[in-house]
Amino acid sequence: MSLYEHAALPLASSPSILGPISGGRNRGNIQLQSIPIEFQAVVFAGFGNSLYPLTGSDALPKALLPIGNKPMLHYPLYWLEAAGFTSAILICMEEAEAHINAWLRSGYEGHMRIHVEAPTILDDSKSSADALRAVSHLIKNDFVCLSCDSIVGLPPIYGLDKFRLDNPSALAVYSPVLKYEHITSQSKEIDAKQLIGIEEKTSRLLYAKSSADVGSDFTFRMSLLWKHPRVTLNTNLSDAHIFVFKHWVIDLIREKESISSIRGDLIPYLVKCQYQKSFTVRENIQRFLSSPNNIDNYDGGLSSQEIKINALIAKDGIICSRANNLPNYFELNKCIAKLTPEQRLVDVTVSERALVGADCMVNEGTTIKDNSNIKKSIIGKNCVIGKGVVVSNSILMDNIVVEDGVRLESCIVASGAQIGAKSKLRECEIGVDHRVEAGRIARGERLVDMEKIETDMD
């Protein structure tokens, strides 16, 4: 299966997802080359409100939550390195800075120089464009933005080459909404769909709004339809939170403080500029395009005077999604596990009378005792799985104790939790360091320490 329409890299060998396969600068079958100075890379490492209770005051930062027993941040950094980037700006909140820097020093296996920025103005009420505004002084060229939760199998060089050839003001990557292998009560509540209007012949992005913002009725301006009469409206797409921008866009963001989110504010703003001349005149967009700072990198002239926003859509069945909510996080863990058949059990102690399925990943220092059965699950470091335990279709992070006779089905268990003996939990989310009492029976519940919630609120 090809990764997308014009590429033929097999997904299982894609270095853009799995990271280094061999030493040096050679990743699998791709010899990496450095990206010219024309592009800079920016990675967002936000708070992760939608991943609660895995995130919180005592938890790992969102960027370091494990996916396939590797920190989430591992994947976008290797995606960039696969494109040949040699450096990146990483924007995080102040409370996450020390954790991320520690991992970059001791756990990061790549070769890029990562410049960590933790602007004091950022908090969990700010969004991606706010973060860009805070580091705008560091952005000198056209730039690539992606989130720390973007898990992408598309060879990145394709999107960059498409940007070079089409020369748009912005390029946004979309993918079919992630399909859940196992529907839970939590996944039913997630609606990440957007209404995306694209002119297929030119890949022009002409409409971009969340389905929740539109309701049952929506309108197209006649000026748009006269200029672009063949628009395909997609209702099954979500953004992968990967964007490529011309440099002048950072000047726009710096001035327009009302633009807070790339997805919710900036992209709709730029889309509107494409076909509403009166709007571009009123907003005086021309001054950004003709600024001396925005010299075209390719021909030495001014940036294109036409505002053009393009879309790149990943084919269905390709990993190109965000781990930005619990159902997606759950599903992407399983997707990554399927792509790493090697090193399923790394320095673990497994009883001869225990069963660990071939579809499981178990990390170092973990012990699995007699008569336990682990299937379709990922277990992190230094966990203790007691006797007669059944774990199926679940994710257990690091330093977890599961006592004898426990049944876990379709659960996510955060680091440091302890599950009391003979508990039966299904479709539950267990918070950091939470102690589940023995014999607890629950389905579809969020089990957290209420005292910690009150502390966080204070």
Swiss-Prot record:
Residues in coiled coil: none
Entry's transmembrane regions: none
SUPFAM superfamilies cross-referenced by the UniProt entry: Nucleotide-diphospho-sugar transferases
GO cellular component, one term: cytosol
Annotated localization: Cytoplasm, Cytosol
MF annotations from Gene Ontology: guanyl-nucleotide exchange factor activity; translation initiation factor activity
First-listed, main subcellular location of the protein, grouped into a coarse class: cytoplasm
Known role: Acts as a component of the translation initiation factor 2B (eIF2B) complex, which catalyzes the exchange of GDP for GTP on the eukaryotic initiation factor 2 (eIF2) complex gamma subunit. Its guanine nucleotide exchange factor activity is repressed when bound to eIF2 complex phosphorylated on the alpha subunit, thereby limiting the amount of methionyl-initiator methionine tRNA available to the ribosome and consequently global translation is repressed.
Subunit note: Component of the translation initiation factor 2B (eIF2B) complex which is a heterodecamer of two sets of five different subunits: alpha, beta, gamma, delta and epsilon. Subunits alpha, beta and delta comprise a regulatory subcomplex and subunits epsilon and gamma comprise a catalytic subcomplex. Within the complex, the hexameric regulatory complex resides at the center, with the two heterodimeric catalytic subcomplexes bound on opposite sides.
Record family assignment: Belongs to the eIF-2B gamma/epsilon subunits family.
Annotated protein name in UniProt: Translation initiation factor eIF2B subunit gamma
Organism (species): Schizosaccharomyces pombe (strain 972 / ATCC 24843)
Record lineage: Eukaryota, Fungi, Dikarya, Ascomycota, Taphrinomycotina
Gene this protein is translated from: tif223
